């Protein structure tokens, strides 16, 4: 099994370019099967394991998927041969549930095995099912698969009981070809929700209000292929911003939308780091001590849960006490035991992590327990004295393209073995 070996203690310096957003791409690719005419050419697609998995699922439906280069895919879904998405690829990733909305919209039926992803807590799809049923679908779950069908889909008002990115996107996809208008209330506002809406509109959909908590989708007769570029990855950018601060380095992160990073920038500034925004870049550097801060994860525009774990690593060597409250996922502190192996002083109480900063971490053999915990471990290795070995890095590969190569470009001593 592959692992990462890091010889820590070097400040990161230089510039790095951010890829397209994982969280947008993994919804856009399933949504591409809505196009009954023409082909979708999608660029700025991150070269990650989750995308490769989706490519295989789309091919299994009978679609033609051509890789034009490492970051560009051409998808022709004119002739889909099955409405069943089953098998190991479907089961092992959460984003496969977007095939439910896409197949339901286009064919009025689907069978999709229940997905997995990162082991960070219960990920129910009750809000998805509630929305599909409101549109007129009948849903059953049997033998680990969602079976769904409808004579027709009729637009309606859907109020989400909780803010859910997955449910917002899935219902947005499903409603594109419904009769009449669908209104999604208490919708998620994340940048990748907006990006999926923009992609749907590029195919001919009529989606308005994405980025607010009320989204209106007026159904159309058909969707067609289009050319589209995936939005830059807010989470990858945030991870490199945090790594720059943690190593007390000086890094310019390019191909970003600074507005999407404001909650992260605000916390870094509060700690004492310097953040300079350009039109499509952010520079992070440190020229003094960093102090502890308190933070609470929240739906966008709040502090993103997906960079909470890397932030925990940064705070582990900041002066004073910090408290992180995780409000999105109930089991997203698995990285803490790994950080403690490296000398961090952290106590978990329920959804809170109480961190007392130490002067330094020391290298150890640690495990990437999930995707973002893996990023936290990489940053921990970069700031530690000695050698760190990270195992289970298949989790990291799900969301960070060629992570060791990017950090090497910034001067890190990191190799994959």
From Swiss-Prot:
Q: Which domain of life is it from?
A: Bacteria
The EC code for this enzyme is: 2.5.1.7
What general EC class does the enzyme of this chain belong to?
transferase
Question: What does the entry list as the binding residues for phosphoenolpyruvate?
Answer: 22-23
Listed pathway(s): Cell wall biogenesis; peptidoglycan biosynthesis
Record's catalysed reaction(s): phosphoenolpyruvate + UDP-N-acetyl-alpha-D-glucosamine = UDP-N-acetyl-3-O-(1-carboxyvinyl)-alpha-D-glucosamine + phosphate
NCBIfam families tied to this protein:
murA, PRK09369.1, PRK12830.1
Q: What is this protein called?
A: UDP-N-acetylglucosamine 1-carboxyvinyltransferase 2
- What lineage does UniProt assign to this protein's organism? Bacteria, Bacillati, Bacillota, Clostridia, Eubacteriales
